Amino acid sequence: MIFKKALYILLFLYIAIVKKGESKPGSKHPFLFKNLVIDKKKLDSSYYNKYDNIKWNGKIIAIGDIHGDIESLKLILRHSKLIGENDNWIGDNVLLVQNGDVFDRGIYGPIIYNFLFKLQKEAIKKNSRVILIMGNHEQLNLCGYFNYVNPKEIEMFFHNDANYRYHSFVNPYGEYHKRLIRLPPMVKVNNIIFTHGGLNLLISKLSINDINLKTRLQIENNCKPIKYDSFQNYLSRDGVLWSDAMSRNVPYYEKEKCSELFQILDKYDAKYLVVGHTRQPSHQIGSYCNNHYFLIDTGMSLFTNYGQPYPNYLKIDDHKIKAVRLIVEKKKKCPHTEIQLNTPNKIKYCVQESQTNLNPVL
């Protein structure tokens, strides 16, 4: 009898402790309590941000990999009328999605992110929004892997001190770590999924919010796989930052890969997938699977093209999807649109526009 009473008391205490734990902010996601990486006292609301059901009734502009090229970025933003001549946000009711890979290869990654963070604040006043997605090169920097960093960037923005740059990205209190770690790797807007690398049947077993959270947790775990997780490695080729098998193979095995794509889209109740990461040799946005799959890494950065920028962007407006290609030249006499940029080089470009309709064929 005494033994039974003791059991009841222990059971009561266990339930009381569990219930008390469930009332804490950190219990919004039970995985966080199992994971020993995170100090629960330091959790903030950014761990619980939801990116799986964003509704937007205005125009959407999506930009692919920038790789340190502030000139291509500003050409796109000026051409799409999102910023004015003074580089302030002017677009009304527009959602801008940048699909990751701002850093590396080029020089101006730090300036670009500071500029985009500024635009995030300004856009709100115009009933607009800027969503920045984490790319694999943001992840590489957060993990202290600097093999793709342009030495000029360290010289110009980090006092030519690699240790200072390391602290800025890898230390949890570093300037860029604090901001980049919050970027979502995957976002769903209306019926469109945006992610940097891509999706596959394995990772798509998880929800968007789980993918975002667990990718972040692995980076915060010194980029090592997380305990208590069956998927294991979110920073591998199976994770959304790096998954490029579909993008690389869809030009050659379109029927097979599109079948896989539609299975994944059905899982997320989506119709379109927009990815970067896989550079398009044509320097134009790639479209596959009856215009449901868009590859928007056009290799735009002038740092990877001997000084020639190839800016492109995806425009979604009034249920119409268009790929916009900007043909950019430096001419004294410009028969097209002339754009003077507020960039370190202060270059004036002659810009010719080419648009391609990408709505699905019914």
From Swiss-Prot:
It holds the Pfam family Metallophos. One of its GO terms (biological process) is secretory granule organization. It is an enzyme of class 3 (hydrolase). SUPFAM superfamilies: Metallo-dependent phosphatases (SSF56300). InterPro entries: Calcineurin-like_PHP_ApaH, Metallo-depent_PP-like. Disruption phenotype: Ookinete formation and differentiation is reduced by 55-60%; the few ookinetes that differentiate have normal gliding motility. In infected S.stephensi mosquitos, no oocysts are formed in the midgut. However, ookinetes injected directly into the hemocoel produce viable sporozoites that are able to infect mice. In infected A.gambiae L3-5 mosquitos, slight reduction in ookinete melanization indicating that the ookinete cross the midgut epithelium but fail to form oocysts. Its cofactor is Mn(2+). Belongs to the metallophosphoesterase superfamily. SLP family. This is Shewanella-like protein phosphatase 1. It comes from Plasmodium berghei (strain Anka).
